[in-house]
């Protein structure tokens, strides 16, 4: 992987990630395909929304179908028939999200398999091996996503262990002869001094890109913005910056304003299945009765398959009848909305008009522009 940086506007960056499997224009949003599928979508449909890279989940694909089944097909690309690049998380987030069935030790994490209850163990070395078999174009180090709230002492211990795991991840990645990209993950909760130590330690180890982890886990938005404003300038300018698990459309906008290049989140797909749809002027809850006889498109400014062909009334009908097609059409729209948002941000950065774009984005939704505390 090669990262090319074209231009900046304030702290926002316009560039691209170059892979053997294709080019990803940045800032980029990556749809989440946890089990080897972006829920309800074929790879061709995902690509048609404008997505150039997707995300897979190491932990869940390890449990089912498992490494051996994956290797029978070649790798995850061959298994799911996605031709573009794939980023896989390391399983570290499951350390956070499956907290009631796990035990963290220096060596790794002991889990109860959420499928059948069997005891299992995952460590940095195993995570690197699984991601190697998946053929991931971007491999993430194995870390602990520090929960929120966490006091300073716990956050320090967690961050320091994640640094040690980062070195073990790097060593195993290299010993496998993996020629793809490996990203480090910056931890330290909401504490700037701990984030400083984490960035410095990861840069000393050396990675192809750097993710900001441990945000969007319940902390106030002001803390997320503050940490991004503090951390991003410390990340080497020639490396991509990835904000993990984020987020709402406004979170993408605020991340880009502060120098983030990559995002992922289940929100557009999960919300679509629940009838919560993103449009230029905010949000449409298609389940509401007021849409029952509305013959207008979901978003008159959207060029997606759903908006070009179907009315709000039809989408409301499908949702009320619990039809699978409704979830699919909603997902197509939400994914396209996110990709259109990213394309708009990229164009605004190219033209040096990012703050004008941001102002219009919030004005259309009747909301104030959040303050930006950067030099």
UniProtKB/Swiss-Prot annotation:
SUPFAM superfamilies: tRNA-guanine transglycosylase. Its cofactor is Zn(2+). One of its GO terms (molecular function) is tRNA-guanosine(34) queuine transglycosylase activity. Its EC number is 2.4.2.29. Pathway: tRNA modification; tRNA-queuosine biosynthesis. Residues 245-251, 269-273 are annotated as: RNA binding. GO terms for biological process: queuosine biosynthetic process; tRNA wobble guanine modification; tRNA-guanine transglycosylation. Zn(2+) binds at residues 302, 304, 307, 333. Binds 1 zinc ion per subunit. GO terms for cellular component: cytosol. This is Queuine tRNA-ribosyltransferase. It comes from Salmonella dublin (strain CT_02021853).
